[in-house]
């Protein structure tokens, strides 16, 4: 560790010969280099503090030489005297040298204990740095700690401000005044049901409660019912209309063909189709097992009946 000594005799500055700025700069550079090599074993915080003090001392030396002062503030040669000697003008720097280093070490130790303070927060004081107060600002379980505040404050309705993700489970105890968020489809369905209930109440009609499936037969019947592409139940009237339109379109397409091999035979007329054959065609299309296999047989049968 580098040791600094102070010479109290005022004749020390007068006894040393004055040198030019080049020699003084080289001596200060060599001294700082030797000090850096000697203080490598010290912690990084002490090394940085000594470097700052050395830079301040060298800058003060250069200003005193330019102003032409009577006394020369310079470091002694390290090789000649064994240790650096500082003039009386730098006594203030030597006395206060330990205080900045101690303050710097305190700030380093407090910054290294940020993780402990976050778990067990210590009482705030004026010595805590500004960065530590900013490090405590975070969001924990619906509580937001604003900047420069010692205690976190609760902010309601964080979902409205977008601070909480959309997929949040509902709380166990829901208050009556708290809103429940739904999508657009559910919102319109709720409004539609409310309007219907208000209309029935205005007409003094009995509002029937919607009963769930309490019996197994209702569930089995729902499984047997035909469903569309979206999983909805298909109406029976729509099924009959679709089958009738399909049968009529197939019959209309069959009128364009002639059964004679030479092309001179009579075509299939609309009068040749009887109501019984039409009903048979509907029944054939309603049955999925004979939907494709039954069509050629009915077509040939109607053609033979019209030919005879």
Swiss-Prot record:
Tissue expression per record: Expressed in the whole plant, except roots. Present in etiolated seedlings.
Phenotype of gene-disrupted mutants: Altered response to blue light (BL) and abscisic acid (ABA).
Alphabetized UniProt keyword annotations: Abscisic acid signaling pathway, Activator, DNA-binding, Nucleus, Transcription, Transcription regulation
GO cellular component: CCAAT-binding factor complex
UniProt motif (Subunit association domain (SAD)) ranges: 181-204
Chief place of localization: nucleus
Location of the DNA-binding region in this protein: 211-236
Highest rank taxon of the organism: Eukaryota
Subcellular location: Nucleus
Biased composition (Polar residues): 11-26
Biased composition, class Basic and acidic residues, residue ranges: 1-10
Pfam families (alphabetical): CBFB_NFYA (PF02045)
GO terms for MF: DNA-binding transcription factor activity; transcription cis-regulatory region binding
Residue segments, region Disordered: 1-26, 49-71, 251-273
GO biological process, alphabetically ordered: abscisic acid-activated signaling pathway; blue light signaling pathway; embryo development ending in seed dormancy; negative regulation of DNA-templated transcription; response to water deprivation; seed development; somatic embryogenesis
Function: Stimulates the transcription of various genes by recognizing and binding to a CCAAT motif in promoters. Involved in the blue light (BL) and abscisic acid (ABA) signaling pathways.
Subunit structure and binding partners: Heterotrimeric transcription factor composed of three components, NF-YA, NF-YB and NF-YC. NF-YB and NF-YC must interact and dimerize for NF-YA association and DNA binding.
Family: Belongs to the NFYA/HAP2 subunit family.
Name this polypeptide is given: Nuclear transcription factor Y subunit A-5
């Amino acid at each position: 560790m580098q040791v600094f000594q102070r010479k109290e005799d005022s004749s020390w500055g007068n006894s040393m010969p004055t040198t030019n700025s080049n020699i003084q700069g080289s001596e200060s550079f060599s001294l700082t280099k030797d000090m850096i090599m000697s203080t490598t074993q010290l912690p990084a915080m002490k090394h940085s503090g000594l470097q700052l003090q050395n830079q301040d001392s060298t800058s003060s030396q250069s200003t005193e030489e330019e102003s032409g002062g009577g006394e020369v503030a310079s470091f002694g040669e390290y090789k000649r005297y064994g240790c650096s000697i500082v003039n009386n003008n730098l006594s203030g720097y030597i006395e206060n040298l330990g205080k900045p280093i101690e303050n710097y070490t305190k700030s380093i130790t407090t910054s290294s204990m940020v993780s402990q303070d976050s778990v067990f927060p210590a009482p705030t004081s004026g010595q805590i740095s500004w960065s530590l107060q900013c490090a405590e600002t975070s969001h924990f379980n619906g509580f937001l700690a604003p900047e420069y505040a010692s205690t976190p404050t609760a902010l309601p309705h964080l979902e409205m401000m977008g601070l909480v993700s959309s997929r949040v489970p509902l709380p166990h105890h829901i208050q009556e005044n708290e809103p429940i968020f739904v999508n657009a489809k559910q919102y319109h369905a709720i409004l539609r049901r409310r309007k219907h209930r208000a209309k029935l109440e205005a007409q003094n009609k009995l509002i029937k409660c919607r009963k769930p499936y309490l019996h197994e037969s209702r569930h089995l019947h729902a499984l047997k019912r035909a469903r569309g592409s979206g999983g909805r139940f298909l109406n029976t009237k729509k099924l009959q209309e679709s089958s009738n339109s399909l049968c009529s379109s197939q019959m209309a397409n069959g009128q364009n063909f002639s059964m004679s091999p030479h092309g001179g035979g009579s075509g299939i007329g609309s009068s040749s189709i009887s109501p019984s054959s039409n009903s048979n065609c509907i029944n054939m299309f309603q049955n999925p097992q004979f939907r494709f296999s039954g069509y050629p047989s009915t077509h040939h049968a109607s053609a033979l009946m019209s030919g005879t």
